[in-house]
Amino acid sequence: MSTTTPEKPEEIIDATGTSDTAEKIEVVISKEEPAEQKNEVEEPDYAQVPAESEDDAAQELAPTDSAIQVVHVLEAPQKAELVTIPLAHSEAEDHKLADADRDQEEELVFNEERRKTVTMDDNASLRSASITFDANRDEQDLLNESFASNPTDETVLMQKTKDEMDATSERPRSPLDLPPPPASVVLHPSAPPPPPPPLSSTEVVGNTTTTTTTHYAPKTWNDPSITTAPKIPVSLLSGAQPLPSVLTQRTTTSSYSAPNYSASSMSGVPSDVAPPPPLPIPNQSSSSAASYQHHHASSISKSISSSREDLLSEHATSRSTVREIPVHRAPSTAPSHSSVFEYHMMPTTTSTYHHVETPSDEYYRREVMTRTIITRSTEALSQTPLGRPASPLDRYLPYPTTTTTTSGDGRTREEKTVDYKVTYHRDIEEQERRIREDQARRQQEEQDRRDREDNARRILAQREHQEMERLREQQNLSERALAERERADKERLQQERLLRQQREKKRREEWDRLESIRLAEEEAELARRRALEKERIDREKAEEERKTMERLERERARLERERLEEERRQKEKAETERIERERREHERIEIERIERIKRERIERERREREEKKAEEDRLLRERLELERIERERRELEARERQELELQRREAEDRERQRLEDEAREMRRREEERREAELVADVHRQAEERERLRKRQEREEAERLERIRLEQQKIDMERIDAERRERERKEEERREFELIEAARRKKEARDRDRLDEMERERVREEEERREKERREQERRIAAEKERKRRQEEEEEIARLNELQRAAAARQAQRNAELDRQRQRDELDRKAQELSEREMREKERRDRERANEEAQLADLLERERHNQLIRENERREAVERANNRRLEDRRSRDKLDHIVRERSEKEQFELEKRRLLAEKEAMNRKKNHLLSSETLAKLTQPMYYTTREPEVTTKVERQVIERIDRNVWVEDVPYAPSQSAMGYLDNDENNRDRLYNPNDLNRNGSSRSRYQRAKNEKARRDFYHSSQDSADPVTERFRKSTDDLTTRSRPEYRGPLLQKFHDSEFRTTALNETDGLPYRRMGPSPYEQPFAKLLEETERRYAHYNSRASNPSIYQSSRYYYPERHGQPQHTDNTRAESVVAYERESRRESPADQAHIRSRSADYLMDRRIREETEVPENQLQKTRVEPHDQSPRESRISEYEMRFRKSTEKLTVPDWYRENRPQGQTAQTSTYRYGNGVEPMSTTTTTTTVINGTSSHQQAPPPVPPQPIGNIGLPRGMFDRYKDDIEELRRSRSSLHQTGQQETSNRQGSTLSVGGIVDQGHALPGYTVSEVPNAWNLHTSRTSRVVEVADTFVGTSSHEYGNFTNRYGGRVTIEEVLDSIFQKVTPTNQRLNFDRSYPQADELFQGNVDGPGIYTNNYSVMRQVLKSPERAEHILQNEELFVRCTECHRTRELSAARLFFVSCKHCYTYYCSRECRHNNWPNHSGRCSFARINTLCKDVIMKVREDEQAQAFMSKVARDGFSVSGRGSVNIRLSSPQLAQAYVSNGWRALSAYPNDQLLYYYTVKALIAERKEPSLIALCNRYEPREKFILSVSIIADIEHCPETPPPETRELSAVQFSSPRSRYEAIQNQNAPYFSEFAHNV
């Protein structure tokens, strides 16, 4: 098998001389080579010179494997001498050789640029060169070059050399004889090559016509007289060097394929496949005839004609091998590319000769090249420098190192070839004629080929059709045979079935006759046996009754004895217990007496220790003061020494810092170098990883391609399987009728068997009474059944063949299904693999992005480090400058230290003097008759009001305790105050009538008024006589006696004790330290503040309207009223939080001249501002912050506040209050909470009352203050605000003796505590969630929960604000009312700025996250809504409402939110978009599923209100339960939500399948508390009217995966525990309610 390889056209470059004729010849040669030779032949790369125009690029190829030439005449040829070659052939042979020559020639390539590079020197040198060949010399002396200046000598020498070679080789004298073929192309002996056609050429030059004919004679190819010429392609040249003028070619193979000669023309159609290049010819030596014959015995070359015109042109020579032609004249020319060549860089070339042609004959020019092989030894004879060879031929005939050959004796030789060209011309008409004939012939051949293909295709289609007809006929025959067999089988089976039926009918008739006879006999025998059995049973029964009576009598006697013994033991046990109780009571009383004595002794010892410790402390303070003064002096001296040492160390530090800076700079430079290396290494690693990734991607692409091919294979198998499946279905359809007939027969047998089994069952019922006969009948029936089964087995055997066939088909089908599953598995694996590869690709992309990010980060860090280093450089420079400055200032600093030392010594002397004066002033001030003492005695008392005659005991104790404290005023002074400033105070000016400090002291006119009263009392005291009846003196004396005789804790009142214990709280769930306390009740002192507040609200009404917008609370809590164009900062209390109390103090109200009283009590009750007190001018001044004054206000403590502070510094908790703290008393707590943001709104009102050892939990309005005990009312004075707390403390102290009894009763009774935390996730949830109790005995899953909702609406149907029962269906909750308002709002296009933060959210803990999404910022209004949800529409009609998104907390005004806000489909949860609703579903799904069940419970309640039948059943259960157990509620228990929905849809008849005792239950109040039911349900059960109403609750058992649990009750009093922050309180509540908090997330 041979392959046709196209070969690039090769450029042949002429370097023999200049010429004006430019031609271009392109040749495409087709070559057939054996397959086994393709790997051995190295095809050279032939260069092609590009065309300079479109005409130059024209090519026309014949459809055969011969070459086509295109010759373009580009310019006028150069005139040259015409060379005539004598021919020895006839004219006919000339035409044949001309045709063959036309097929073997190539186009001449013209390149005008080459001609321009030829110099005159080159032309002259080349024209003067001549070559002399000596054929008689041996191989070593093969080449002998001689140069002459006469050009004619060259021609003579060449002709002489040619004649000698012809005589030596003994070849034919034909001038155009062909050389022998090479050894590599020897033909197979069985297929000799055909002789080539003759080649003829006709040339017209002027008026002379020259015809040349080349004849190819069939002769032996191994003719020794034939020579070959090597040829080297252009591709061996370097790309940077000019092309050589002559190319040679070398052959390295030993095979030859016969050339295919066919007529062609230049206008023919090019062939589809370009012909391959000619076979290379091995390099041979031509030194002698013997060596020539030895090396060229099997060589052959192509015939190429040459002419003198070709030798004179610049065109490149052909690749074709040529025979030697004697040349008479050889003018040389320069190389076509450049004039300078190195012989070792260029292939071997030859000289060419040219002659002048006419321009009209250029198109028909043909080229024949003759090659003469010239060898040269490796000694490089007469070699000139490489720059310019000595001979003109050397520059054109280089000897590359690769073009060498080895002779027979092993010595290396280099070879050189010289090409000669002869061009012939032909007639144009002859060429056109041949072209037309070739075209017609090719068209005819193509038409014949197409006809043959059509005939073959038609014959193949006929054969396929006949084969299909044959197969179809065979299929029909097999189907008809199968149908005939099936029909015969059916008929046979039908006949057999009829025979069996007849035999069975006869057998059954015989069996019935025998059975009737047997039954008659059995009936008679059975009657006889029944009579005997009845007599035996009567006897046994009588005997058993007698024995039973005897046993019962013995048991009765034994029980009576045991009862008497048990009564005796009980009496003895009761007596023993009574004696033991009396003994324990006596022991307890004795222990209490001993403990009381011990406590009194311990208290006495403690007082003695305290007095002793006080004395020791006083002496210690005096000693410490003296030591402190001495220590200060020593410290001053040590400080001076330290400063001198510090100066020295600073100098050393500066030097050390300089050295460190230099070292740091060196380290910085080293770090920069390392970081640069690190960045370069990272870049290198990234490139390596990128290369690996690309390789992995390439491997993945290949793997995907393999998977695609496998997928195609799987698809083909699937198609084949589907075809086979269709064939199987067709076979099964034909077999279905047989199987169906067998199935019907089997069903008939089954029916008979069932009938027989039914009769057998009847017989078994009769055989219970007669076992022996029954056994015989069973054996007979078994024998009959065995026969029937035998017949069935025989019938089944006949069907085994069909079943086996069906089984085989089923097995085949299963196999196909298995293969299908395998294919599906392969598909799945392929899909997984592709997905895995996709993920890997994404991972690689991510890694690449990460690496890029890391590189960017490294660069950014490098830039940042660079900035840091620059800053360090600047800082180092600055430090150096500072060190130079500090060195200059060191002398000045030493002088300054000396001056400071002297000034400090003077200051110390002045300080000692002033301290002495201060002590003298203090002694004078503490004198009995000093102005300070008189001011204390004459100031208004704390309890003094307009009705001073009424004073409570608690107030007297507090006031007396305060009055007994000595008040000392210590005025602090600033450190910068001068030494003489201590003398300029009010103590030094005490006796002056006018004190300038009075105007600035506390900034109040009350101090001036008080001081005037003190001065008047002092003067009266000095001038009046001592009166023993003076009440002031008597009271002072009494107070002094009490201080010395009574223990200090006994004078401590409960009010102060409660203050120090932080018990002035109003909530049990919130940490309120640091917040204003709530309002306790009305007071006359609130009137001035109310007026001021009303005026403030009137002035800032526009602020209240803006405060409802939550966006103003984003950044600041101050509002900015316009005042002279400047914003005035005022502290905003944020519209009063729900947990913020209405704190109103006399300190914050303006001074009232009609009523002047002390502010100590207000200061006592307000812990938040105790550390920072301001002048009580008015409320606005209290929190105003001036824009230009940003410094904090300095605290100015008034004399009364200082006095009270000193009086309460050392107070302790009295023992009577600590030991007898009230326990189990009525504790009323009211908590209102309304959260912001995601923090919920909740209202919890809890009242826990202990009565007779029981506890009840009720939901009630806020508590009413209790009435005072003993009909003693507190005066309307300064304690009016706190009278509730004082009254409570008085009650607790007056009833201390009742505490022990109440504790005893509490221990004996069953105390049930209902927690104060009743937060279910909604404001008024009305439902509970719990696990299914075990007592219910229901089979439920682990995730089943019981959702219970109570019908808590028991109010009247009419209301002052409308019939809301009809409007809301009786379900009045916060969510339902707010949702109805939201649905009624008309949407607008208003777009408000939303606030993503939590507007008005305080930092206190909020109990849940399910507060209503619709709210208003007016907390007082929201409190009213919480109390009365049914009045929500009326309360909120003038308020601005907002809606908040549960997911992103986006806030909108109600009308604007109506456009795009959406809600959950099952509950009242709002979202700003469907995306937020989708994103929040994982967190909301648990509660929402719970809410759906809650809604379904409410639907059941509403259905019951309309269902009279249900009400009748429930009313009966309620009456019976109340008459038996007391108050309680009726509960309807539904086992699933589907059952509840069925009841809502169909009414009570949907529950008719369930008994009432499985649906309706009655729970007492005690059971509800024990099961922790909804507090509102318990409250309703305690107050409803049983004769008129009943309470209903609905329980649905639902399987909810994440259902919130009912929070457990609070087991301890959180208000009694101190917390450092709201966060700590939140954590405490969270730990206590772990099950509840585990289901919901809370935000604090």
From Swiss-Prot:
Residues 254-272, 282-306, 799-814 have a biased composition (Low complexity). GO terms for biological process: cell-cell junction organization; embryo development ending in birth or egg hatching. A zinc finger (MYND-type) spans 1445-1488. Residues 997-1007, 1295-1313 have a biased composition (Polar residues). One of its GO terms (cellular component) is apicolateral plasma membrane. GO terms for molecular function: cytoskeletal protein binding; zinc ion binding. PANTHER family: APICAL JUNCTION COMPONENT 1 HOMOLOG. Controls adherens junction integrity. Required for the correct rate and completion of elongation of the embryos. The coiled-coil domain is sufficient to localize to apical junctions. This is Apical junction molecule ajm-1. It comes from Caenorhabditis elegans. The lineage of its organism: Eukaryota, Metazoa, Ecdysozoa, Nematoda, Chromadorea. The gene is ajm-1.
